Swiss-Prot record:
<comment type="function">
    <text>Catalyzes the isomerization between 2-isopropylmalate and 3-isopropylmalate, via the formation of 2-isopropylmaleate.</text>
</comment>
<dbReference type="InterPro" id="IPR050067">
    <property type="entry name" value="IPM_dehydratase_rel_enz"/>
</dbReference>
<dbReference type="InterPro" id="IPR001030">
    <property type="entry name" value="Acoase/IPM_deHydtase_lsu_aba"/>
</dbReference>
<keyword id="KW-0028">Amino-acid biosynthesis</keyword>
<keyword id="KW-0456">Lyase</keyword>
<dbReference type="InterPro" id="IPR033941">
    <property type="entry name" value="IPMI_cat"/>
</dbReference>
<dbReference type="GO" id="GO:0046872">
    <property type="term" value="F:metal ion binding"/>
</dbReference>
<feature type="binding site">
    <location>
        <position position="412"/>
    </location>
    <ligand>
        <name>[4Fe-4S] cluster</name>
    </ligand>
</feature>
<comment type="pathway">
    <text>Amino-acid biosynthesis; L-leucine biosynthesis; L-leucine from 3-methyl-2-oxobutanoate: step 2/4.</text>
</comment>
<dbReference type="InterPro" id="IPR018136">
    <property type="entry name" value="Aconitase_4Fe-4S_BS"/>
</dbReference>
<dbReference type="GO" id="GO:0009098">
    <property type="term" value="P:L-leucine biosynthetic process"/>
</dbReference>
<comment type="subunit">
    <text>Heterodimer of LeuC and LeuD.</text>
</comment>
<dbReference type="InterPro" id="IPR015931">
    <property type="entry name" value="Acnase/IPM_dHydase_lsu_aba_1/3"/>
</dbReference>
<protein>
    <recommendedName>
        <fullName>3-isopropylmalate dehydratase large subunit</fullName>
        <ecNumber>4.2.1.33</ecNumber>
    </recommendedName>
</protein>
<dbReference type="Pfam" id="PF00330">
    <property type="entry name" value="Aconitase"/>
</dbReference>
<comment type="similarity">
    <text>Belongs to the aconitase/IPM isomerase family. LeuC type 1 subfamily.</text>
</comment>
<dbReference type="InterPro" id="IPR004430">
    <property type="entry name" value="3-IsopropMal_deHydase_lsu"/>
</dbReference>
Amino acid sequence: MAGKTLYDKLWNSHVVRTNPGGTALLYIDRHLVHEVTSPQAFEGLRLAGRKPWRKGANLAVPDHNVPTTDRSQGIQDPISRIQVEALDRNCQELGLTEFRMDDPRQGIVHIVGPEQGATLPGMTVVCGDSHTATHGAFGALAFGIGTSEVEHVLATQCLLQKKSKNMLIQVSGKLAPGVYSKDLILAIIARIGTAGGTGYTIEFAGETIRALSMEGRMTLCNMAIEAGARAGLVAVDETTIDYLKGRPFAPSPHSWGQAVNAWQMLQSDPDASFDRVVTIDAAALKPQVSWGTSPEMVASIDGRVPDPRQESDPTKRGGMERALEYMGLAANTPISEIRPDIIFIGSCTNARIEDLREAAKVVAGHKVAGNIKQALVVPGSGLVKRQAETEGLDQIFKEAGFEWREPGCSMCLAMNADRLEPEERCASTSNRNFEGRQGQGGRTHLVSPAMAAAAAVAGHFTDVSTLNH
């Protein structure tokens, strides 16, 4: 019998029924819920006279619309307030677990799930949010779903899905100082393109991946969707198991050994066949900075903004020209000469404790440059915020001139009070640099937390590995 990939194993173990036409009914183990994609789903449930099939499989948290400044004043925007209040009401009425805005465990759903141990190896995990792929770092099959599918999961705990093809991204070599998992995933997307993973589930493997922390692996899987993939996966190892031990939703000490034995089987077989294999030399990577309006428009810190005239494909050339016009950049500008106005360290990609520690190392002993209008640090959850404050990271940021905020999605997307003004340029640790993503006319450059911190103190993009030399 031919070997199975990790994705094959996860898929096969959750198929309830195979249908003609290539689709299958999949059982869903964990459903994460937030305020933006759930109101219509709850209303559909109510109109049909249905109740959630398995209440305990759901975990809800408001994140997209919540304010990151003084919460005693409530939510000022009426639409945002209505969505958060609807989530509170729906969860209370239906008996679903929710970490409300005033709960110390509240935060971004893709940070809260893992830190609570609600994401476990071998699970299927869904959420009405495209960056659900984050949870694949735990050897779980995790993907984003639409509002109608949110209702389906609530009602039946199942979803109709079509199986993806298998892609392996094999990464070897040691990441250089100042180069992080964010740089790695940006370089991967630049290599294969934003459509390179379309129709695939990507497994990230190799010595470089095994050396990453769980935080680093989550960053990698978080942006698999930006390469067009349905999901991203990392096989289970001791790093996974050590991270999960003792978490609130993790197996009890009594059943821990049995769970670990099962989890350790969540690997691709040595003779498993992949539909596509991509190899990456991590040791050759420099810190990455996006220059355009797509996550594939990326250059190394020692590079330049590319010249569209050198692109032979007319469609790509036109896209590059439009991107440069929107971004207010000239071809051949050195990346290190680009000067951001705003610094944003946060989002489900890079707002975990490790991210804040790395940024704080860069900031310590420095001040935010005079040309920076605003520098924000937004922890990914209340628990991350508390841990950072215990370590004194908040004081390092505040002394340098950063604002220290409450947890939430914040400036990743223009759905709350944190947003860019037209033509403001932001060094952002988030995952998308589309036109208007951070605010109408706002210009986004995707970077790692360390690179965002370096840009804050230098006033321009600079190689973080040489900042203090």
